[in-house]
């Protein structure tokens, strides 16, 4: 049996809501419904009664619940033990490409410079979309996630690392937003919710990317503009803020599992400043 089906069943039984379960699992609601149907087909029974705003476990669902909890607990314990033997000196850090390029690359260098207390530790810098990294974190395939969004699941611990400033940059001075093509650099779903009000509701991105380096290199060729961290843009040089734009403050969080066996190590590593400019 696919453990992902059991995990989805447990989340729906906990939230009693397909939409909230989908949000917690970082899935679409249709994906959650499909997984539940798969599990019901495998077992040959209905697990939930479905009425609008009223999802309840059936008698079969109630019987499955303790077994599902035990199976998932055993599976997680097994994964933890196996992972511990193979990753004793490894420490994986996940983030988007833009975060690695603009700030975490420097932090990784500081971690190596301050490694006396953790000699022999092998770091893995993992680049992926946030949704994929959250899943890896939940499944103990990732030790630490650095992101611009606070965690949404109770089993995660988090620490606010500070804030960084974004500004709208282009390659030439004295440019207005209306004169430029927009390049969308992904800074998280919550950033995109406010994006239309910042660049114009009808503005369609000419390019979308998760890489700050790529976006910065394309600005001049595409007569474009994009949101970049101010401190990083100043170091790069050759970039100019768009005249009729504003600046934005973005938070940076470290997220890890509450019951991680590397809790002490994580807190020690986070004592080394992640951001060059913390405020």
UniProtKB/Swiss-Prot annotation:
| Keyword Repressor among UniProt keywords | yes
Gene Ontology process terms (BP): negative regulation of DNA-templated transcription
UniProt KW keywords: DNA-binding, Repressor, Transcription, Transcription regulation
Q: DNA-binding region(s): which residue ranges?
A: 18-37
Q: Which residues belong to any copy of the HTH lysR-type domain? A: 1-58
Q: Which domain of life is it from?
A: Bacteria
Pfam families reported in the protein's UniProt record: HTH_1, LysR_substrate
Asked whether the keyword Zinc is assigned, the reply is no
InterPro entries, A to Z: LTTR, LysR_subst-bd, Tscrpt_reg_HTH_HdfR, Tscrpt_reg_HTH_LysR, WH-like_DNA-bd_sf, WH_DNA-bd_sf
A single Gene Ontology MF term assigned here is: DNA binding
What family is this? Answer: Belongs to the LysR transcriptional regulatory family.
What PANTHER family would the database entry show? HTH-TYPE TRANSCRIPTIONAL REGULATOR HDFR, TRANSCRIPTIONAL REGULATOR
Q: What does this protein do?
A: Negatively regulates the transcription of the flagellar master operon flhDC by binding to the upstream region of the operon.
Name the UniProt record assigns to this protein: HTH-type transcriptional regulator HdfR
Its taxonomic placement starts with:
Bacteria, Pseudomonadati, Pseudomonadota, Gammaproteobacteria, Enterobacterales
